[in-house]
Amino acid sequence: RLIKEDMKPALGVTEPAAIAFAVALARNHLPEEVTRVVLHLTSGLYKNAFTCGIPNTTHVGNDFAAALGLVAADPQKELLCLDGVTEEDVKKAEGLVKNGIIDVIMDRITSRIEIRAVVMGKKHEAEVVIRDAHTHVVEIKEDGKTIYSADNLAQAEENEIPFIHRCSIEDILDYIKTVPYEEIAFVKEAVILSLIHISEPTRP
C-alpha cells in the first residue's frame, strides 16, 4: 500500500505537481478572486521542489508551481494537474510571482511530506492540508471552518512517526525477499510508463 501511494502517475517531478494540486484545490474552495497565496512546506518538500523544472515551462521552484496551480491546474487530475498548461498560463503565473502574491514558508525541518496551501481573497480564505503522500488530503477549510477531515486525521498528527520511519532495514529486506510478484507487478507498469514519457520529445 505504501509503495502504491508513492507511485501515482505525475507530470514531471512529484513535489511541484503536489504543490500545484494543493493550491488548485484550495482555489476551488474560495468564492472570489485570489489575492494572496501562502504556502507552508516542510524542509524536505521545500528542498525537492526548489530547483525542479516544471513541465511545459522554463521555470523551477515552489513559488512558480503554486502560481501555476492557481491559474491553470485541474485538481481532479491530482499529480497530472498541470497537463495542458499553455504559454498564456505561464505568462499569468509569471505575473503573479513578479507581483509577490505568492509567499512560501518552510515550516520545519523534516523529510515528512506536508503541504498547507492557504489562498485568500478580499473577504474569504480557504486552506488545504496534504500529509504523508503527495495527494493525501487530510483537511480542507473554508474561512477557518473545517469542511473535510480525513478519517485518519487523528492518527496523522504532526508528531506521529510515519510508517516508513518505523521500518528497519531488516523489515524492508524481508519484504523484498518474500513479497509475491503479483503484489508488486504494478511497479513494472510504472517503469514502462516512465520509459514512454522520457522517449517523447519535449515541447519547444
Q: What residues fall within each predicted segment?
A:
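Generic N-terminal amphipathic, Lys/Arg-enriched alpha-helix
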Residues: R1-L11, K47, D171-Y175
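Short, N-terminal intrinsically disordered low-complexity segments that are rich in Pro/Gly
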Residues: M7-P16, P180, I184
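Short, conserved micro-motifs enriched in small and acidic residues
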Residues: G12-A17, N56-V60, P204
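Alpha-helical support elements that line or immediately flank enzyme active sites
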Residues: P16-E32
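Catalytic-core signal marking the mid-to-C-terminal active-site face
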Residues: E33-A190
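Conserved small/polar residues in nucleotide/adenosyl-binding loops
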Residues: I196-P204
